[in-house]
Regions:
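Multi-pass membrane proteins that catalyze or facilitate reactions on polyprenyl-/lipid-phosphate substrates
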Residues: 1-160
Length: 160
């Protein structure tokens, strides 16, 4: 996916060796993505031990998978009747980004899809399906890198 979206993700465009163009929209998007990562980073660091100790159970995971599956069906049916207020990725504001980031916090609960939670959140606040999916993809890159780095640091690079 990163290879496929590289031109859209990379904020620089090289015309030749001497001249490069900075894509301001891409820089702006990455700043919004960084803002959207803040809520889940804070909550993940604060509650990681609790989530692992008390919610990492088959029953919680099963309940959450069923709950979000049903919720996704309900939101999709409800959303068919609405016209999105944010149509394009470039139209996503910092406020919308932080709200989508708040929905990403739900993915800390085992059994919750990170992309599902952020897409549902984006649809609820009026983002189009396409923009919601694209923003969720961009949001995955720093989120997964950060979560992986956190776990590696926490466990001292010990692999089992």
């Amino acid at each position: 996916m990163v290879v496929m979206f590289w031109n859209k993700m990379f904020p620089f465009q090289f015309k030749n060796k001497a001249q490069s163009i900075v894509k301001k929209d891409t820089f702006s998007l990455w700043f919004k993505v960084a803002v959207a990562c803040v809520p889940s980073a804070i909550m993940g660091i604060l509650f990681d031990d609790y989530l692992d100790a008390y919610l990492q159970t088959p029953i919680v995971i099963s309940i959450m998978l069923i709950f979000y599956g049903l919720l996704f069906i309900l939101i999709e049916n409800w959303n068919k009747k609405r016209t999105p207020t944010t149509m394009a990725l470039s139209d996503i504001s910092y406020k919308t980004a932080i709200l989508i980031g708040a929905f990403q916090v739900l993915s800390l609960i085992p059994g919750t899809s990170r992309s599902g939670a952020t897409i549902i959140g984006a649809l609820l606040i009026g983002v189009s399906r396409v923009a919601a999916a694209e923003f969720t993809f961009f949001l995955a890159v720093p989120t997964m890198l950060g979560a992986s780095a956190f776990k590696l640091l926490k466990f001292g690079f010990e692999f089992t």
